[in-house]
Swiss-Prot record:
It is found in: Endoplasmic reticulum membrane. It is a multi-pass membrane protein. GO terms for cellular component: endoplasmic reticulum; endoplasmic reticulum membrane; serine palmitoyltransferase complex. Keywords: Endoplasmic reticulum, Hydroxylation, Membrane, Transmembrane, Transmembrane helix, Ubl conjugation. Residues 118-121 are extracellular. Ceramide-sensitive subunit of the serine palmitoyltransferase (SPT) complex, which is also composed of SPTLC1, SPTLC2/3 and SPTSSA/B. It comes from Rattus norvegicus (Rat). Plays an essential role in the homeostatic regulation of sphingolipid de novo biosynthesis by modulating the activity of the serine palmitoyltransferase (SPT) in response to ceramide levels. When complexed to SPT, the binding of ceramides to its N-terminus stabilizes a conformation that block SPT substrate entry, hence preventing SPT catalytic activity. Through this mechanism, maintains ceramide levels at sufficient concentrations for the production of complex sphingolipids, but which prevents the accumulation of ceramides to levels that trigger apoptosis. The chain crosses the membrane at residues 22-42, 43-63, 95-117, 122-142. The modification Hydroxyproline is found at residue 137. This is ORM1-like protein 3. The keyword GTP-binding does not apply.
């Protein structure tokens, strides 16, 4: 252990999803959210699954595709200032294990939600729109692209 030394990463945002235990913690947080929503009285199971999916995808969209920059003062001369967390992750390399995990997780949650809502039309449409809103920005073709200038600065 090196006491008193700084981390070796220029931008710690690039490797945060590769930290030990982060994937398990992420899945457990989704499970905890679901259990908390299940504990609300008079809310049906299909509504809870849809709420779990919508809250997860909203949080994922905000934290990965809307928030830009880094909370650290980095010596990269402002390169990370204009990039979302998704674009910074793994130094922008596509198809890494972390990116695959964060792409597959909402898909698995979508399948579970669709199953437990018994493919109800309203739930299905809400969950599909929510899934597309987090999957489309993850496409490699949209790396660094700001559609209609949204989130440009």
């Amino acid at each position: 252990m090196n006491v008193g030394t700084a981390h070796s990463e220029v931008n710690p945002n690039t490797r945060v999803m590769n930290s030990r235990g982060i994937w398990l913690s992420y899945v457990l947080a989704i499970g905890l959210l679901h259990v908390v929503l299940l504990s609300i009285p008079f809310v049906s199971v299909p509504v809870v699954w849809t709420l779990t999916n919508l809250i997860h995808n909203l949080g994922m969209y905000i934290f990965l595709h809307t928030v830009k920059g880094t909370p650290f003062e980095t010596p990269d001369q402002g390169k990370a200032r204009l990039l979302t967390h998704w674009e910074q992750m793994d130094y922008g390399v596509q198809f890494t294990a972390s990116r695959k995990f964060l792409t597959i997780t909402p898909i698995v949650l979508y399948f579970l939600t669709s199953f437990y809502t018994k493919y109800d039309q309203v739930h299905f449409i809400l969950n599909t729109v929510s899934l597309m809103s987090v999957l489309i920005p993850k496409l490699p073709q949209l790396h660094g692209v700001r559609i209609f200038g949204i989130n440009k600065y």
